[in-house]
Amino acid sequence: MGRTTSSPKAMMRIATVAAILTILASTCMARNVLTNGEGLYAGQSLDVEQYKFIMQDDCNLVLYEYSTPIWASNTGVTGKNGCRAVMQRDGNFVVYDVNGRPVWASNSVRGNGNYILVLQKDRNVVIYGSDIWSTGTYRRSVGGAVVMAMNGTVDGGSVIGPVVVNQNVTAAIRKVGTGAA
């Protein structure tokens, strides 16, 4: 068999897909994620533990901790049932009124790509997506997940072997072409 090689760009795509799958796998019991093109219509919500991110019937997008509102889009209009909030393919999260006009946006347009909006257990709502550009020299942890740099390292160490990617999931990243963990 021929030797398999992989570019840093391909490895980054694999790492991005693995991170997204990890986030999605940890949400099997509760719906707390929107992916490209998905949205919340009046009465629908994302939920995790005591937090609820809901598109209300009045067109106001609100984040609740238990029954206390802690953030709102301030787009509420009495009697305007039919609004929706959409995670767009360009990275922007937008609230549209009943006539399809944008009334609020996250202003996070980054170009077409793979984006997810996550209601996290730390009461934060975050949009994650493809990096636009990177030197590949960073090392950081995001929301309890290990982030792999383009050079194949995490916190200065090799990622070959078991890597804890969040509090509940362990993943083994394999070197391409060897079959070994």
From Swiss-Prot:
One Gene Ontology term from the biological process aspect of the record: regulation of defense response to virus
A Gene Ontology molecular function term of the record: protein homodimerization activity
Annotated keywords: Antiviral protein, Disulfide bond, Lectin, Mannose-binding, Plant defense, Secreted, Signal
Residues annotated to bind alpha-D-mannopyranose: 56, 58, 60, 64, 71-72, 74, 88, 90, 92, 96, 103-104, 107, 114, 120, 122, 124, 128, 133
Domain Bulb-type lectin span(s) in chain numbering: 31-140
Signal sequence extent: 1-30
Gene3D superfamilies (alphabetical): Bulb-type lectin domain
InterPro entries in the record: Bulb-type_lectin_dom, Bulb-type_lectin_dom_sf
CDD domains: B_lectin
SS bonds (residue pairs): C59-C83
Purpose of the protein: Mannose-specific lectin. Shows agglutinating activity towards rabbit erythrocytes. However, it does not show agglutinating activity towards human erythrocytes. Has insecticidal activity against the cotton leafworm S.littoralis and the peach potato aphid M.persicae. Also displays antiviral activity and therefore may contribute to defense against infections.
Other remarks in the entry: Has an inhibitory effect on SARS-CoV-2 in Vero E6 cells (IC(50)=4 ug/ml). Viral replication is inhibited by 80% at a concentration of 20 ug/ml, and 50% inhibition is observed at concentrations of 5 ug/ml and 10 ug/ml.
Protein name as annotated: Mannose-specific lectin
